[in-house]
Amino acid sequence: KVFAVIVVCFLFSLKVKVPVYIEDAVAAIAWAFQHIGKYGGNTDLIFLSGHSAGGYLTMMVGLDKKYLSKYSIDANKIAGNIPFSGHTITHFTVRKEKGMNDIQPLIDEYAPLFFARPDASPLVLITGDPELELLGRYEENAYMWRMMKLAGHKRTTLYKLEGFNHGSMAEPAYPLLIKEVNAITKEILKRK
């Protein structure tokens, strides 16, 4: 099987403030929906993924429906959201913009957790080892997994990669991403 990968480099937070970097990611994703057909792609099979801040952006775009709606795209049209070690609370960069420190949690309109809902696209959370991860990242993702379940979401999965830290967890996460993309793709194509 062949995957087409669109790599988006997001804006640096030193130059812009929230929500500009979220909106920039949304514009790139909207471009994919609007143009993937020209490259032989299928809008029913667009998956989002990213590591760390990219994982945070993946979840913000996939869960807060207002962002893609500006482009007349329903966030539920995303085939699956597969963040690698993403913040599920408000990102520490946003908290820093608000004068907060790295370990002071916040769940507001800039937190994927704020938008836990039953009808979201499949969500596959992948993190490193709780003892090696950055700033409680595994625990944030475990909380997201639980809240999605409590919200009635039927397709949230959590993977914990023992022995891998925040930076090294990406390499062993890719086979899981491919496995999940293949499984979700099969489900989607079966419904067609």
Can you say where each PLM-predicted feature lies in the sequence?
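A fold-wide structural signal in alpha/beta-hydrolase
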Residues: V2-I6, F47
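Catalytic nucleophile-loop/oxyanion-hole region of alpha/beta-hydrolase
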Residues: I6-T43
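Primarily recognizes the serine-hydrolase "nucleophile elbow" in alpha/beta-hydrolase
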Residues: A30-E97, I107-D108
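C-terminal catalytic histidine-bearing segment of alpha/beta-hydrolase fold enzymes
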Residues: A142, K149-K192
